[in-house]
Curated annotation (Swiss-Prot):
Keywords: Bacterial flagellum biogenesis, Chaperone, Cytoplasm, Translation regulation. Gene3D superfamilies: BH3618-like (2.30.290.10). This is Flagellar assembly factor FliW 2. GO terms for biological process: bacterial-type flagellum assembly; regulation of translation. It is found in: Cytoplasm.
Length: 129
């Protein structure tokens, strides 16, 4: 599915279109959809790994037209390592997808408000909660 990037991924501010592909119930691939860019991310469904909740800031709700949206997806960027157990997840900067309108953006959460989320957490650190 092709998405318009309304709130850019940090460090990739020049990318305005991205393609999201579901791998399975836990993993997804996010690739740039522009000819001049070869950017690819592995994403993970945070709810499959841990209890995860946060408040979406109002400006991002407006940008992504989340009010009244029926299909919203939250995913987090994962840094894949070998073996997979060494992989890390960025829980502090989730990606939000409005599947109805094909809009997406990244929100950086306030670490003071969400001290239990970090930029690099081991993928297995919450699997037994």
């Amino acid at each position: 599915m092709l998405f318009d990037v309304k709130a850019p991924i940090l460090g990739f501010e020049t990318i305005h279109k991205m393609h999201l592909q579901k791998v399975d119930e836990i993993f997804l691939r996010l690739n740039s959809a522009e000819d001049n860019s070869v950017v690819s991310f592995t994403l993970v469904n945070p709810f499959a790994l841990r209890k995860y909740e946060f408040e979406v800031p109002t400006p991002l709700k407006i940008l992504l037209e989340l009010e009244g949206a029926k299909s919203v997806l939250i995913a987090n960027i994962m840094v894949v390592q070998t073996p997979i157990e060494l992989s890390t997840v960025n829980y502090l900067a989730p990606l939000i997808f409005n599947l109805d309108k094909q809009l997406m953006g990244q929100v950086v959460l306030d670490s003071n408000k969400y001290p239990h989320y970090h930029l690099r957490e081991n993928i297995l650190s919450h699997t037994h909660e």
